[in-house]
Design a protein with these regions (language model features):
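Structural motif
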Residues: 3, 57-58, 212-213
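Surface-exposed beta-loop interaction hotspot
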Residues: 145-157
Length: 244
């Protein structure tokens, strides 16, 4: 019997029509569905399959009882994990690995930025599983030619950004003419080019360049991630010197 691991982002609140059509095909072919017990896509998938009285479903959990279970007729599989791990995300990864390894293909409904879904996609590539990805931002499934590790990486990083150390690493392996070799020099470069302005414990970004960055503020702390276009910005200004 064919089987599919359905996963996706917790941020998603409703099932897109194209995803529903895919679920209907799964039902018509009596494909066994493996799904987790989280909010978001997990419970949306469970609810839809339960509404169709489809019970060829296995809900996987690391808990004694699933956090979400839409039907008492669903099978339950309790997955063991390393109990010494304190990170909830790392604990849940054991469940995702189990579902990837025990199914024929993966169907991921993704917002483009959830790390768990990104990891499931990468794992499917690594294990040579058949893969289908519905990308919410473009309201469709990715085409065959778009299903490559590099394309998925670009989608993820365009939504979540690169860390300063990742940008420095890319500069080092590029043809960009610059003396940036560490994170502190990257920050200094942006300040010198008047793209960043240091104000007390925060950095302000010139409004003309806001689209190059992703700013996150959490509990009074600021973090800045960089979009890929930052490399072009550095390249242009490194070649022609500082802006007047």
């Amino acid at each position: 019997m064919k089987s599919v691991f359905v996963s996706g982002s917790i941020s998603i609140k409703t099932l897109p029509s194209e995803v529903i059509k895919s679920f209907d095909k799964i039902i018509s072919q009596n494909i066994q569905v493996y799904v987790g017990d989280a909010d978001g896509i997990d419970i949306l998938t469970q609810n839809y399959l339960a509404s169709k009285s489809y019970t060829n479903v296995t809900v996987c959990t690391i808990k004694e009882h699933p956090r979400n279970q839409a039907s008492n007729l669903f099978n339950i599989s309790r997955v063991n994990y390393d109990e010494t791990l304190k990170s909830h995300r790392e604990q849940q990864t054991f469940k995702d690995i189990y579902m990837t390894n025990n199914t024929d293909y993966s169907f991921v409904i993704w917002d483009g930025k959830s790390k768990g879904s990104f990891s499931n996609i990468k794992r499917a590539f690594k294990e040579n599983k058949k893969l289908k990805i519905y990308y919410m931002s473009i309201d469709r499934c990715l085409l065959k030619e778009e299903l490559t590790p590099s394309s998925i990486e670009n989608i993820y990083k365009s939504n979540t950004g690169y860390t300063p150390s990742e940008i420095v690493a890319k500069i080092k392996t590029s043809n960009i003419y610059t003396n940036i070799s560490k994170v502190s020099e990257l920050k200094e470069w942006f300040i010198n080019h008047k793209i960043f302005k240091q104000t007390q414990n925060k950095l302000e970004i010139d409004s003309k360049y806001k689209d190059y960055f992703i700013v996150e503020n959490y509990r009074g702390s600021q973090s800045i991630k960089y979009k890929k276009g930052v490399l072009e910005l550095i390249n242009e200004n490194s070649i022609f010197g500082q802006r007047a």
